[in-house]
């Protein structure tokens, strides 16, 4: 038996395949999902999620969101996401620099909060590429 896993961002479906295991960056730490997992609905942090299927592990950087697990179906809704293998190292470094500049120049509390989230995502992308 396997999990029916879907990872969806506002602009695209990132993953829609079966898997044996999913590891997610939840608000309370890393969360592992296997078949027959209890029903669950929880918030996600920005970070790297991993999916294991018959061909091995796949890593996806996600920018926050939610996960719903029920009856071996895993629905992951994220604000943004991309495969780690598709991230260019030099572009990721530039994105961190740009996000840091935006964060440092933000003045209003809402601007600062949004800039902090984008900085966290840029840093997660860079770390994922460096660590792979």
From Swiss-Prot:
<comment type="function">
    <text>Produces ATP from ADP in the presence of a proton gradient across the membrane.</text>
</comment>
<keyword id="KW-0793">Thylakoid</keyword>
<keyword id="KW-0934">Plastid</keyword>
<dbReference type="InterPro" id="IPR036771">
    <property type="entry name" value="ATPsynth_dsu/esu_N"/>
</dbReference>
<keyword id="KW-0813">Transport</keyword>
<dbReference type="GO" id="GO:0045259">
    <property type="term" value="C:proton-transporting ATP synthase complex"/>
</dbReference>
<keyword id="KW-0375">Hydrogen ion transport</keyword>
<keyword id="KW-0406">Ion transport</keyword>
<comment type="subunit">
    <text>F-type ATPases have 2 components, CF(1) - the catalytic core - and CF(0) - the membrane proton channel. CF(1) has five subunits: alpha(3), beta(3), gamma(1), delta(1), epsilon(1). CF(0) has three main subunits: a, b and c.</text>
</comment>
<dbReference type="InterPro" id="IPR020546">
    <property type="entry name" value="ATP_synth_F1_dsu/esu_N"/>
</dbReference>
<dbReference type="Pfam" id="PF02823">
    <property type="entry name" value="ATP-synt_DE_N"/>
</dbReference>
<dbReference type="InterPro" id="IPR001469">
    <property type="entry name" value="ATP_synth_F1_dsu/esu"/>
</dbReference>
<keyword id="KW-0472">Membrane</keyword>
<comment type="similarity">
    <text>Belongs to the ATPase epsilon chain family.</text>
</comment>
<keyword id="KW-0139">CF(1)</keyword>
<dbReference type="GO" id="GO:0046933">
    <property type="term" value="F:proton-transporting ATP synthase activity, rotational mechanism"/>
</dbReference>
<dbReference type="GO" id="GO:0033115">
    <property type="term" value="C:cyanelle thylakoid membrane"/>
</dbReference>
<keyword id="KW-0066">ATP synthesis</keyword>
<protein>
    <recommendedName>
        <fullName>ATP synthase epsilon chain, cyanelle</fullName>
    </recommendedName>
</protein>
<keyword id="KW-0194">Cyanelle</keyword>
């Amino acid at each position: 038996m396997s999990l029916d896993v879907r990872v969806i961002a506002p602009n695209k479906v990132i993953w829609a395949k079966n898997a044996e295991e999913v590891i997610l960056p939840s608000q309370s730490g890393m969360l592992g999902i296997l078949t027959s997992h209890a029903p669950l609905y929880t918030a996600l942090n920005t970070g790297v999620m991993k999916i294991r299927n018959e061909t091995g592990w796949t890593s996806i950087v996600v920018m926050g969101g939610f996960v719903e697990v029920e009856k071996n179906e895993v629905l992951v809704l994220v604000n943004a996401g991309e495969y780690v293998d598709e991230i260019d190292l030099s572009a990721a470094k530039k994105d961190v620099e740009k996000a840091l500049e935006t964060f440092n120049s933000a003045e209003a509390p809402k601007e600062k909060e949004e800039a902090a989230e984008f900085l966290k995502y840029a840093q997660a992308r860079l770390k994922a590429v460096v660590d792979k």
